[in-house]
Amino acid sequence: MWNVDVTCIGGIRSGEATLRPGPNIVQASNFQGKSSFLAAIQTAIGTTGLLTEDHPLMENEDDGKVTLETDEETYTVSLTRATDSDEPAISRSGTPYLTRDQDQIAARLFAVLGEDNPIRAAVREENQERLTELLKKPLETENIDLRIEPLQREIKELEDEVAAAEAASADLPAAQQKVTRLQGELRDLNETRDELERKVDEETDQRALRDELTAKQSDLEREEARLERLENQVDRRKAQLDDKEAALESLDIPDSPTAEADIAEKQTRIDELAVKIDLLDDLHRSTKAIIDEGEIDLITDVERTLSGDTFSCFVCGAETTAEAVTERLNEISDRQESLREQRATLTEEVTQMQQRTREIESKRQQKAELEDEIKRLRVDIQEDQHEVRSIEATIEELQAEIEQREAEYEAAEKAGESHSAELKTIQQKIGSTETKLDRAQAELERIEAELQKRNDRQEQLETKRDELETLRQRRKQKYNELVNQFDAAMADIIGRFAPGFDGAYLDQKTDANDTVGFEINLARDGHTTDLDTLSEGERELVGIVTALAGYRTFSVGDRVPCILLDGIGQLAAEHIRHMIEYLENTAEILVTTAYPEAGSFDGETVSPEHWDVISHETAQSRDHPQITN
């Protein structure tokens, strides 16, 4: 049971009412505060001021307030008009029934079904694009699309890196062929040199000096090439180290969540609660139906007296009354609601714990990989630098030895000894070819390193693609459920209302950019038709069904136990009754409006007789329209 106390909201200066489980019909003529009362309930549950809408503070009043008292809590929400600006803004304070943005948006779209409901308005205006935007709103509050977009960018970057590495791999055959060719040329040059040397007198000192000098020069060129290659390698590894250290420093790992055992325990508890809720629901529904229909005598003996009917309890056999059974049913209903709240809380906790665990594990793995790579790079750089120093020392020694050998060789040459010009040319070619071979081998090593980098990036790419697919499946699941709920609700509505069309379908379409859109299509006389062919009442009916599909898909009933229905004057009185009967089992509390000429309804009638509301004449004298009916 809800008690609602209203001050200066819409067209109600002051008023209060009690809402009970089941249908609650606010029945009155125009300008008696029907719609304003529903706006007050909206204010209390926290669904006003959303989607560029204003809070419903009474015009020319600076303050308004709504107090909602439930069986468990009391919620007070105040509205205040700022008076220090040219265009006064209305702000909200206090704690509404719903505090999370995600819950408020879902309730505004799918539980507050007044004439200004955004879903109904989009259907009424045949705005399929706006309808798509609104149906996707709850998933936006889960940040699914916001998480998909950066993932797609990361995947694109990784794909570009892999493609670049693939391009580098295309150079691999040419690099391998170049190394093989230079090795063959060097082998041929060495054979030619050996042949020429055999023709030279190997007994002369000049021969020995020449061989020694050539060997030293070859050693020097080889060491210089090694030094250049190592220095370049050190520079590359230092750059990689800086990148890895920067990435590690920017990596933020949240605190570890509860252990997996807690998640399993909570999931077990959720399953247990679901069983209990279903059992209580079956008991409540069947027992209430027997009591409401006055069919107690079907299952037990009823003793009818002037003071009231009594009968034997059909469970324990004790004597009881319908009022006592009804009171017990209310207690069962309260127990159901408590179990639903526990289940919703546990479900939210499990979802958050699982998501947090996945994020932490991913970041820990990333951190471990970065630390391993940093450690390896540091060791490699240290080893390279040690080798650089060793090579530099070797080069200094070789340069000194070459200077000495050149002086000795020049002295021997002056003594009349001469070298073969052809042999000198071959020896020079050997040194040049050895240098080219060293450089070709270095280039081959670089390309092979790029191929290894490609493999690493490919693994990262697969991980990101899996994560993206998980998010897309979550989104697809909700979208499919939305379509199924629409189809099921529309089938029920057609059976109850017999409208002038055969069926309505919520079609889901995905474009080349993986963007999902929704479109309502109708069937009439075996042909597909548009919303503009419907009557005003039929269009409102389709809008309400669309909102109800969202209500069930996004479990809005687990967030707020009520549905507010207003602005259904386009429906005939019998159709209003059908709508109330249809919605009665959808939410614990149903609040709707009706005119007196619609007749009487089953359920609780809420009368505005004692409310202080703005009169029709006062409303007409305002500069701006005010919610009063």
Swiss-Prot record:
This is Smc-like protein Sph1. Overexpression results in modifications of cell morphology from rods to extended rods. Residues 139-282, 318-487 form a coiled coil. The keyword Transcription regulation does not apply. It comes from the Archaea. One of its GO terms (cellular component) is cytoplasm. Its main location: cytoplasm. Keywords: Coiled coil, Cytoplasm. InterPro entries: P-loop_NTPase. May play a role in a late step of replication. It is found in: Cytoplasm. It comes from Halobacterium salinarum (Halobacterium halobium).
